[in-house]
Structure formats: C-alpha cells, structure tokens
C-alpha cells in the first residue's frame, strides 16, 4: 500500500470546533490547552449528526484518531457519541498538531500587524514565524505518520486548520502549491467534515464557521 492510500477505507477528516483562542483572535499553533467554546461544541455536535446521517444505513467499526490537543480530543468525543464509537479507544498523536507558530504562538493577531502576512484569498500564512514551521515541515511529519498507518478500518480523524489542509492535500495527491512547495487542499469553514477514500474527497458537511486560522 502506498503511504498516500487509505487502503480502500474511508477517512473522515475534520478540524476541531471553535476555541476560546479562535473567538478572542489569538494564535493557537501547537498549544495543547485551548478548550472549545459553546459554539465549538455546537459545531462538533453538527459534525457528529452529519456523519451519523452519512452512515445511517451502516454500522461500520470506526477507528478514532486525533491530535493530542484538548480541542481535538473534545471535538472527537462529541462526534464519537453520535456515531456510537468508543472515545476511550481513540489514539492521539502529536504529529497531527497544528502548525508550530514558534515565538508567535499565543500572540494576538492584532499585535502581529505588519509582521505576520496572511494570504486572505487562500487562507494561508505567507510568513514563517520565528522558530516556527513551514508547510513543508507539516507535510514531512504527516508523511511519516501516514507511513505508519494501515487503515484497516474506516477512521474518524480530528486535526487542525492548516495541518488538515496539508493532510488532505497529500491524500488527494494535489500538486504542490507553487509558493509553498507543498500539497495544500482548499480551505473549508470551521465545522466542516470530509471523506477521503484512496485519493477522492467528498464533503460530508460544510460548516458555518470561519476559515482556517492556526
């Protein structure tokens, strides 16, 4: 099996719900403890309902995987309840964390005006934070993670805005972004969930939140 395959199984990928950092306008990066807001829990609830409807005629045995951050694990717990999966059997991995924003992690976006360039059309950071990761760095850790997966069952995976876009880009075999030399999928509103099976992506639910911010 190629490391970019899902072995004929479905991989349901979502970003965590809105957090207190999202709401306040702070950069999370790889910060571990940034809990969901009420809106974030509602988004997780909607994603869980949508996935349950998508699987309504099936009773698949689902694997659960998430970043090891609170916001990802909280989101996964709500979705798991809707689809009858055991959250206690979930696996977490730090390689699924958000882009490391280095010295800017935890900063307020307003305080980085003139320093952090954002491509608002594509929803991507155009500046590498001091001590932070590039999109290529994210791809390298995700490729290593993918190389260890056998995808023996359908899987629900909760990650983060930028990281999930790179993961989706890798799994759908997109051409590298000309500016960042990395496969990066299109951004989706917070609260969205997609299905990827052997390179084909299908949007299961389109959320109503904002686009990706780390």
Regions found by a protein language model. Name each.
Residues 56-95, 117-118, 195-214:
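Conserved histidine-centered catalytic loops in small-molecule metabolism enzymes
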Residues 78, 166-170:
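Active-site signature of alpha/beta-hydrolase-fold catalytic machinery across serine-
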Residues 9, 15-85, 133:
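Active-site-proximal alpha-helix that buttresses catalytic centers in soluble enzyme cores
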Residues 1-10, 53-54, 85, 97-110, ...:
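Acidic, low-complexity terminal tails and accessory targeting/binding regions
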Residues 14, 93, 158:
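Generic enzyme active-site microenvironment
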Residues 21, 81-141:
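Phosphate-handling substructures
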Residues 19, 163-164:
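Short active-site segment of divalent metal-dependent hydrolases/proteases
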Residues 11, 62, 152-161:
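Generic beta-sheet signal
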């Amino acid at each position: 099996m190629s490391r970019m395959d899902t072995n004929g199984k479905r991989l349901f990928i979502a970003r965590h719900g809105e957090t207190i950092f999202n709401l306040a306008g702070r950069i999370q990066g790889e910060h571990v403890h940034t809990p969901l807001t009420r809106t974030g829990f509602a988004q997780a609830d909607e994603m869980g309902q949508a996935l349950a409807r998508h699987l309504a005629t099936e009773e698949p045995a689902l694997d659960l995987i998430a970043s090891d951050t609170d916001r990802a694990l909280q989101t996964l717990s709500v979705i798991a309840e809707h689809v009858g999966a055991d959250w206690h059997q979930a696996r977490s991995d730090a390689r699924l964390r958000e882009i490391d924003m280095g010295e800017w992690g935890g900063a307020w976006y307003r305080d980085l005006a003139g320093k952090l360039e954002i491509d608002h059309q594509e929803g991507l950071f155009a500046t590498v934070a001091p001590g932070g990761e590039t999109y290529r760095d994210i791809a390298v850790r995700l490729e290593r993670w993918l190389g260890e997966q056998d995808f023996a069952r359908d899987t629900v995976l909760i990650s983060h805005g930028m990281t999930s876009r790179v993961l989706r880009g890798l799994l759908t075999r997109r051409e590298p972004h000309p500016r960042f030399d990395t496969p990066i999928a299109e951004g989706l509103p917070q609260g969205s969930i997609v299905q990827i099976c052997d390179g084909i992506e299908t949007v299961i639910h389109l959320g109503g939140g904002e686009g990706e911010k780390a």
